[in-house]
Amino acid sequence: MIEISRRKLLAAGAAGAAASGAAEALPTRPWIRYQAERATANARARWRADMIRETYRMVWVAPDWNAKEMFEAFIGPDGIPTHGAACVTYPGDPGRRMAFVAIDTQDPNSITMLRTFKKLSHLIDFHIFPLAFLGPVSEFQGATILGAPNRALAMDDQITLFSQKGSNGIEYDVSRISEDSERKIWANTNLFRATRGVDVPFGVYLGMDGGYRPFNNQPDWDHYLALFDLVKAK
């Protein structure tokens, strides 16, 4: 006859009870799983909605401003700038959703926002339009970037140099800036004003729901992720 010690019996009993409790804790029935998934989806939707509402509260727009009108004034149906405007874009995944972005090379908030967008450019197709908004330096730097053989590289140089102490960004030679580049920077600036833009940085994103969402420099990463439909939950 095989003898089993009392200690082994107690251990086996405890293990069986734990397994039974764990099994009961799992949502074994389909409707329970459905309810749990629905609650999670609702929580995600509420989080995104809260983030987007908070983003809107931070954006300053004119009373008669129209998001769709501004977006389509800068970016045509084929994704090409219109009205003589010109922009900087970065390579990324095909089929990315588009965002119009107006910046000034001498505006610290614009540079901060662009630094963040560099991390998202493979997911969102940012069309970045430099403006001559804050003065002659902005005009000449913007024109230099738009006239560069590689605009994205020139913009990267501006972001890097502007962030260095004692530097206001890339150097430029007024005598070498083409008339075409000058026309483009002023086309950007005048179009922004014509569509009732009031401050930089400023942008409009075409969301997955077909809505046009205005934005500016946001306080944290989560706001951008929610705004650009990049996450479902925090």
Q: Predicted regions span which residues?
A:
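N-terminal export signals
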Residues: 1-3, 8-27
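Short, exposed beta-strand "edge-strand" segments with a Pro/Gly-rich flavor and a Y/T-containing core
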Residues: 1-2, 23-25, 95, 144-148, ...
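Intrinsically disordered, low-complexity segments enriched in small/polar residues
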Residues: 9-14, 19, 74-77, 82, ...
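Alpha-helix boundary/capping residues
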Residues: 16, 148-149, 162, 228-231
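Extracytoplasmic thiol/disulfide redox context detector
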Residues: 22-101, 105-137, 176-199, 220-234
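Thiol/selenol-based redox catalytic cores and closely related redox-interacting motifs
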Residues: 134-223
